[in-house]
């Protein structure tokens, strides 16, 4: 398949030089970007391509990467709000989740993937249960994902760990390489050191990364300190986890010493600002982490604690939160935010050649309308307008792995009406 995107008003490549191409084109050959340049250098004719997409009045970006979510938790959107994390989990979320059947997970994930496509996310990292159902939806829906079967030691134990490993081996590199897998011990407060060490051993043996929640609340920090005489991050080091690639969600309560350690280890952080605000958890020291060379991406967490999957909105909140926390208006500028949402996210999820619009890179591309919303006028700085005024609903076209999965706001891989019907059917059954 050969696709031409032509006459693009502005292309933000997100490369290391922060290159911008005005009135440009992108040629996609199979699943990779073959050529990217300004229109004056285009030597091909439209009939040389299987599909030609007009980029007039559009901005092109690399597809966005959601570094941490729980996709099927769309089923719990609006179910339990305005509660602290541990009470929220123990009294509302975990009891509800015990009632879910595999088919529920399938439809919850399908609603999430529909929402992600419609708001410009092309890759996401997911931790939940019944992940085989989520993998099926990813395969059908066309997105790229890193999937992990969440493990809580008291519920899962060795049997659950074996199931998680089986899932990882069955689905890793499936769907034309769009699916990767990780092992996922939920958190230090739900998994003992011995359990974490067992996960680390399997991670090493089968070359799998580790996805976990770390230092999300002050309560967790104090609990781990009292029980193990270390910080949650040091807990990972003591169990050997930091010898392996780790995707660490939250990292709010970390010390300077923790960050110095992280800078030397293969750990990436998923910053989830809206969930952290909504649950009253705290503010991750993102600018400090970035200054030390730690790779940080942006996640939404689940929709029950956010309550949407719009990464543009998430990025705006995340930028503003760092500015006010640091009392510094220059904290997390839009160029940094774009890097976090694209190439940083891709790297910490384990994808090479992703997150940059560059020849030879995977063709995950989104187009954003510049003339259909008041938010983009005047056109002084379209990237600034997107992150500080726009939303994911401004995305018009989504391409993943060289395949168009949304065109002119129409999702081509999922029946929207069927998804809405099934979700309402599940909700009625739960009431």
UniProtKB/Swiss-Prot annotation:
InterPro entries referenced in this protein's UniProt entry, alphabetically: Amidohydro-rel, Deaminase_MtaD/DadD, Metal-dep_hydrolase_composite, Metal_Hydrolase, MTA/SAH_deaminase
Free-text cofactor note: Binds 1 zinc ion per subunit.
Disulfide cysteine pairs (residue numbers): none
Residues involved in Zn(2+) binding: 68, 70, 213, 301
MF terms in GO: 5'-methylthioadenosine deaminase activity; metal ion binding; S-adenosylhomocysteine deaminase activity
EC number: 3.5.4.28, 3.5.4.31
Pfam families referenced in this protein's UniProt entry, alphabetically: Amidohydro_1
Chain residues that bind substrate: 97, 186, 216, 301
Parts of the chain that traverse the membrane: none
Keywords for the protein's UniProt record, in alphabetical order: Hydrolase, Metal-binding, Zinc
Catalytic activity: S-adenosyl-L-homocysteine + H2O + H(+) = S-inosyl-L-homocysteine + NH4(+); S-methyl-5'-thioadenosine + H2O + H(+) = S-methyl-5'-thioinosine + NH4(+)
Domain of life (superkingdom): Bacteria
Entry cofactors: Zn(2+)
Protein family according to the UniProt entry: Belongs to the metallo-dependent hydrolases superfamily. MTA/SAH deaminase family.
UniProt-listed PANTHER family: AMIDOHYDROLASE-RELATED DOMAIN-CONTAINING PROTEIN, AMINOHYDROLASE SSNA-RELATED
Function recorded in the entry: Catalyzes the deamination of 5-methylthioadenosine and S-adenosyl-L-homocysteine into 5-methylthioinosine and S-inosyl-L-homocysteine, respectively. Is also able to deaminate adenosine.
Protein name: 5-methylthioadenosine/S-adenosylhomocysteine deaminase
Species: Halothermothrix orenii (strain H 168 / OCM 544 / DSM 9562)
Lineage per the UniProt record: Bacteria, Bacillati, Bacillota, Clostridia, Halanaerobiales
Gene name linked to the record: mtaD
